[in-house]
Amino acid sequence: MTTSHILSAVDPTTGLSGNVSGGGGGGGAGGGAGSGSPQHVTHNGHGHGHGLGGVAAVSGGGASVSGNGGHRVVGGAGSPNELDRNLRISLDDRELWLRFQNLTNEMIVTKNGRRMFPVVKISASGLDPAAMYTVLLEFVQIDSHRWKYVNGEWVPGGKAEVPPSNPIYVHPESPNFGAHWMKEPISFAKVKLTNKTNGNGQIMLNSLHKYEPRVHLVRVGSEQRHVVTYPFPETQFIAVTAYQNEEVTSLKIKYNPFAKAFLDAKERPDTLYPHDTHYGWLIPPPTHYTAAAAAVAAPPPLSIAQSHGLVASCPSVSSAESVGPSSGGSCDRYGRSLSSRSVAPTRTTPYSRPRVVSGSGSNGSAGNASSTSPQPPSAPQTPTSLHSTSTGSVSTSVSSSSGGGIGSAPSTGCFSSSYAQSGFMSVDASPTASVFSYPSSWQSNGNYWNATSVPGPMPMNVCSGRNISSHNSPSPTNGSPSYTTSSPSYTIHHLTPHSHQYNMAQTDIYGTGVGVGGGAGTTGSPQAAYGAAAHQVYHPTPTSPTHQLYTNAVLNAPSALSYSASGWHNGSGAEYGLYQNAAAAYYQPEYIPLEIGYATHPLEPVDVSKTLDDPQAAMYKPSDEQGSVITLECASSSLKSSHDIKIESSSLEHAGERGTVGGGAAVVSVPTAVVNGAPAVAADTWTPLTPPQSTLQ
C-alpha cells in the first residue's frame, strides 16, 4: 500500500511518481499485518521502495529501524522522525468502541450522508508545538468479500465490490500547529458516510462491506513530508443502509445523545428536561437560619431584572448584594445559594410531597421581593411569584413590593409561620395569596380578587397577627385561573394546619354569626354565588336511605365548590380545626344528614340522637310533654294531603333525655324546613320531609 493518495490529499500539486516509500500493512494483500502499530513514511525525493508486511524499506541513506512506544519509526539518519519519537495518538471512548466491536459495529450510509456514532476522536501528544500538521481520516476496506446478516450473525456473502477511489476525510482545522492539535481531543464528528458519489466532501462507502478508520498525521510546512498512520481495529464497522442487529440499535440509542427521542420514558435521564431542575426537596428548617435571619437587616430590594435569572453556581452572582450567616456568597450543604433563588442543576428528583407557598417571597417574608435574607433549606427551590414573570404574568406582590422599602427589618426572621410544617401553608396565611409556578402562563396573584390585600409599598410585619384571607374568586370552580389559594390540584395532607381549604365565608355556609377569624377576613365575599343559609337543600346519596331527614343548612363548601368532597379530610375535618365554628364540627363534608339509627326498613320510625350545647341546640331539644312518632309513606311524586301519615302520641317516662322507645321506634323532635325552601315551622308542627321525586337529580 502506498501513501500517494494520502499525500495527494494533503498537497494535490506535489508530483509523487517514484519517490514515495510506503509503509505496508492493513490493506490489500497485506491483510492487516501492520495493524496496531503506526507506519511512518518519509517523502524525501531520494528513496523509493515498497511495503513488505508492514515494514517500510527505505533505499539510500542508511535505514535505521528503532522500536519506540509500540510503533515503528522508519527513516534515514537525521530525518524528521527523530523529532516525533515521543508522538502518541490514543483513541478516546475506546471502551464504547469495544462494546460495539463485540457486537460487530454497523454504520448507516445514506444518499445524503449520515454522521458516525461513535465518533472517531483521538488525543495527540508529543507533537512539535511549532510544527504544522494535517490530520486525515481514511476508511480502509479490510475484506475481499461482502457481508450479510443471517440468523443473527454476520457471515461472508459474495465477492467484494471495487472500493471507492478516495475515501479520505481531511480534518477541517488542518493544517495547524502541533500546539493546537495537542490542546484538546481531535474529533471527526462532521464526517458523513454516503453510498453515492455526490462529491460534497462526504466519504463514499460500499454497503455491506467492512471498513476500518485510520488516522494519518502528516507533518507539513517543510520540504520533506512525514506521514504517521494510526490504525484502530476496535473502530471497524460494516456499512449498512439500515441496522441489522437490534443490539447495535439499542446500544446506539442508549449512548447517542441525538437519539434520546427513541428511549422509553422510564429510561430517559432526568437531565433531558431542564424544567425538572426547578423543583427541589422540602427539607425541615434548622433553627440556626431563624436565629441568623433575625439579626440581619435586609438591603433594598433588587429589581425584577436583577433578581429574575436562575443562579445555578455557588457562590451566587448576586453575592455582592446578599447578606448571609457567614459571608456574602455562602452556600448550604446542598450547593444552593442562600442569598438568591438559585437552582442546583443536579437536583432533578421531583418532590415527593405537595408544595404550598404562602406569601410572595420564597423565604416567608410577605413583602420582601428580593428576599436577600438567608432562606431556609425548606424553601421550595422553585421560581415562585418573582420568577413567574417569565411565563407571561407578573404577580402583584412583586410589582408592588419592589418599588420601595419593603425589605425592612420587620420582614426578616419570621420563618416559623411559613415553614413550621416543612413548607406547607400555615393557618395564618398572608393576605397576599399564594402563586404557584406552574409551567404555564395562566396563573395570577390572589391580590387581584382579595379585598384585604395591602396595595403599594406599605411595610407589613409577617409575624404579626393576621387575618385569614378569604377566597373571593368570582368563579367557584377549581379550574379558574384565578383560583390560586391552596390549589386543589395538590392533595394536601389533612393534618396540615393550612387555612380553610375553600376560603368561603362561614356565615354563608352555616348560617351562624361566627365567621373566619371573627368575620374580619370575609369582606367582599360574593354572597350571591352560594345558596342562602335559611333554605334546605336536599340531595340524597346513593349510599344513604331515602328517608333521611336533612337539617336547615346548605351543602357545605366541598359540594358547593364542585369538589369530590368524599375524599377531602376523610369526613373528619372538624377534628383538625378546619371549620371555624362549633356547629360545623358535626357536619359531614358531603351532605348534612341527621345522625339517625340504623333502620332495618325504610318505613320504620327512627331515633334522632343529637344534642348540642350551642345556640343552635334549641332546635334539637325534645318536647317535654310528648313526642311524635311519624310513619312516612310516599307513593306519588309530590307531597299532597292524601298521603297516609300516621301520627302517634305516647307519653315518655324519660321526657328530658334521648333514648329508644322500643322496637326500633324513635322520637323525632327536630324542626326541619320544607324541601321547597319554605321557612321552618314550629316545633310542635310536623311536615313529612320525604321530598318530591321530581326534585331528585
Swiss-Prot record:
SUPFAM superfamilies: p53-like transcription factors (SSF49417). It is found in: Nucleus. Keywords: Developmental protein, DNA-binding, Nucleus, Transcription, Transcription regulation. GO terms for biological process: cell fate determination; cell fate specification; germ cell migration; heart morphogenesis; hindgut morphogenesis; Malpighian tubule morphogenesis; mesoderm formation; mesoderm migration involved in gastrulation. CDD domains: T-box_TBXT_TBX19-like (cd20192). Residues 1-60, 316-407, 462-488 are annotated as: Disordered. Residues 20-35, 50-60 have a biased composition (Gly residues). The keyword Cell division does not apply. Disulfide bonds: none annotated. Residues 96-264 bind DNA. Residues 316-330, 352-373, 381-401, 469-488 have a biased composition (Low complexity). GO terms for molecular function: DNA binding; DNA-binding transcription factor activity, RNA polymerase II-specific; protein homodimerization activity; RNA polymerase II cis-regulatory region sequence-specific DNA binding. Required for the specification of the hindgut and anal pads. This is T-related protein.
